[in-house]
Design a protein with these regions (language model features):
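Hydrophobic alpha-helical segments within soluble ligand-binding/sensing domains
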Residues: 60-102, 203-224
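An alpha-beta-alpha
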Residues: 78-128, 225, 229-244
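Conserved acidic residues
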Residues: 30-32, 101, 157-158
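Beta-alpha junction/loop-to-helix N-cap segments that form part of ligand/metal-binding clefts
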Residues: 6-66, 164-188
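Flexible, glycine-rich surface segments
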Residues: 135-144, 148-196
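Flexible loop/turn connectors
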Residues: 192-241
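Short beta-strand elements in bilobed, periplasmic/extracellular small-molecule ligand-binding domains
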Residues: 1-14, 76, 122-142
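Glycine-rich, charge-decorated loop segments at or immediately adjacent to ligand/cofactor-binding or catalytic sites
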Residues: 63-71, 145-148, 193-202
Length: 247
């Protein structure tokens, strides 16, 4: 009863993110909750006075173009990160597909969070002594995702997809290419995995939402200075499998 919510869906389009955020700023809302990296970037660019809480954002320093990072943005932006347990996901790839000769990493080149995860997965595989060739397969958007996925499926023994908004929106398309080709897909989070993967080690997004909501209450009630609020993460991690694809 104390809060009015204005929920808008950008439908995966960056231009829509900008339009929605600009409308919020013109209305002088009390807080902007930005779900995903593109929305957070639009909000951070549009206002330096309205508190902005991000959620489902993987890499805050990259999203906000910050050269130094200690967990606190130091401005009107904070929130929660959905950064996956990448070291453990690298271990999962090697455990499930131990004889892989080529591991493909499929992601959208326009998403800095995906680039960040890719770098860590590659270094983690190297540290674990992985002998497979690790190759990146990047698409720029929905127009070329099918062609790039087809190339990856033709060359790889296993494909890894990080937490990637474009891939999540096109998971069915990816599955329609990889499953007939017999190429297993291991994913960075549960939503993508349900659409096209065999397994993931994922955070609990419900818990992430709860944490973000608690931060919003603290900001709105004046109990916290957002410029001093550290970005938080979900604590629970769980393994998820899709049995019908694992067969």
């Amino acid at each position: 009863d104390r809060v009015t919510f204005d929920v808008q869906n950008a439908s995966g389009e960056v231009s829509n993110c900008v339009t929605v955020i600009n409308a919020f700023v013109s209305e002088d809302v009390d807080l902007i909750l930005a779900n995903s990296t593109p929305v957070l970037q639009a909000a951070a660019s549009a206002t330096d006075s309205i508190p902005v809480l991000g959620t489902s954002v993987t890499d805050y320093p990259a999203a906000l173009d910050l050269e130094e990072w200690n967990g606190v943005a130091g401005n009107n932006v904070s929130g929660t990160s959905d950064c996956a347990p990448l070291q453990q996901q690298a271990e999962m790839i090697m455990e499930l597909i131990p004889d892989a000769k080529e591991i493909g990493i499929l992601y959208c080149s326009a998403e800095p969070n995906s680039r960040y995860q890719t770098d860590i997965i590659k270094s983690s595989l190297e540290e674990l002594g992985c002998s497979a060739e690790v190759k990146e397969y990047t698409f720029t958007g929905t127009d070329d995702i099918a062609a790039v996925t087809t190339t990856a499926a033709e060359n790889c023994d296993v494909i890894y997809i990080p937490t990637d908004n474009t891939a999540a929106s096109n998971a069915e398309l990816i599955n329609n290419i990889c499953e007939p080709a017999g190429v297993p897909v291991i994913c960075g989070e549960k939503g993508v995995c349900e659409g096209c993967g065999i397994a993931t080690l994922t955070i609990d997004y419900y818990e992430l939402g709860q944490i973000t909501g608690e931060m919003a209450v603290d900001v709105l009630e004046g109990d916290a200075d957002i410029s001093q609020m550290a970005v938080r993460q979900a604590e629970q991690v769980k393994k998820c499998y899709v049995p019908e694809r694992c067969e």
